[in-house]
Amino acid sequence: MPDDSSARLARTAPAAVPPRALLVAMSYWPEPAGSAPMMTDLATAFAAAGTDMTVLTARPNYPGQRVYDGYADGSQDRLTVDGVRIERTLTIPPKGGGMKARLIHEGVLHGGFLAAQGRGRVARHAAVLSLCPSIFSVAVANRFRAPGGRHVAIVHDIQSGLAGALGMGGGAALKAIRALERNALNRADAIVVLSEPMRDVLRELGVRRPIAVIPPHVDADAVHPRPRPADQPPTVLYSGAFARKQGLEQVLEMARHLKSLRPDARVLLRGQGGLEEELKAQAAALGLTNVEFAPLIPKERLAEGLAEGDVHLVPQRPEGAAFAMPGKAVTILAAGRPFVCTCLPGSALARLEAEIGAFLSTPPDAPEAMAKAVADLLNAPDRRTAMGRRGRAWVEGNASRSAVLARYAGLLLNGDAA
């Protein structure tokens, strides 16, 4: 792949940003996966543009389902990082990932959020952002909105849809989550979703507030195309959480098929999470000598790490594919690399593939088809280069930090995301 690092975007601030703003979110720095990188970048972008920015969040615990070293005792519950004031509260990670564990985790955390308000630790704000998941964050954030202020709820996952698809909880629990989603979101002033299909699902749920579609964003200055390392074999890269909803079992099966198509290629799984040991055991049982595991790369070396992948992977379980637009997809496009994803017809990724032609999709749970798509790209370096350039161009026009910041600022100030 060519090195296009000289053609980076200049940072530009929007015409106006709120003087003060609050983000209520379970996910934030230093968590390296999930929604945390995107929320961290959004908050720091507001701070860099002049907003007095506060984040109310959990002690970092994802992926891995344990509070990070140095945070459990509360000594880092009040920090200022990159101009953003970070306020954290007691966190009990959801061991096991079931519905009961998640409810305990979210109940304790959001009770702490409300206590922070009651004790005067975090005040009401005229401009409030919240992140779903958790829908409890959205409900709590409504309490932090000052009279006459605006609250914008950012929906990355639709929890009732994902919970039902992944078998978490029974019918009564799902009905309760749907009712909470509908009520909490209808009390926000505006809602942001990542894709048109997500907007459609919220409308079907009974959400009637204005909904803007703003794709996942990335700091396109920090994440940019870099040349691949010259001394490595052809590399297929997955980077992210080792969690159930990623459907990583199909990646191992894909690697088994790829071994006969491209015996010189390696499949590098870089990440951490609750499924790590299970995945390693499965890879060993299948005799996958072409699969390697590695930890997530530090944020400051993200562009370098992404450059290692000739072809990237964005797997999803089919049941949850309609409810989420993976942020990692946009990050890969910013790095000028193509990827192969699993998605359903009409889903957010399927529509984006048709729009920009910068990646390939295969049906979920079809590892042989996924392996063929990966091999086809490995065999066509010129095609990979062209797809990478198209993906990068789309990010610069639609998903860069400056483009997205202007839209969020408009929603907070006057309800206009144009």
Give the predicted meaning of each segment.
Residues 1-75, 79, 258:
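N-terminal subdomain of nucleotide-sugar transferases
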Residues 59, 197, 214-217:
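Carbohydrate-associated surface elements
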Residues 124, 136-139, 143-147, 172-191:
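Membrane-proximal helix-turn-helix segments that form the acceptor-binding/catalytic region
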Residues 149-152, 160-183, 220:
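Nucleotide-sugar donor phosphate/pyrophosphate-binding loop at the beta->alpha transition
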Residues 203, 217-233, 247:
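Acidic anion/phosphate-binding donor-loop and adjacent secondary structure
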Residues 229-255, 268:
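Conserved donor-binding/catalytic core segment of Leloir-type glycosyltransferases
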Residues 233, 276-303:
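Nucleotide-activated donor-binding/catalytic signature segment of Leloir-type glycosyltransferases, i.e.
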Residues 246, 298-304, 312-333, 338-351:
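Nucleotide-sugar-dependent
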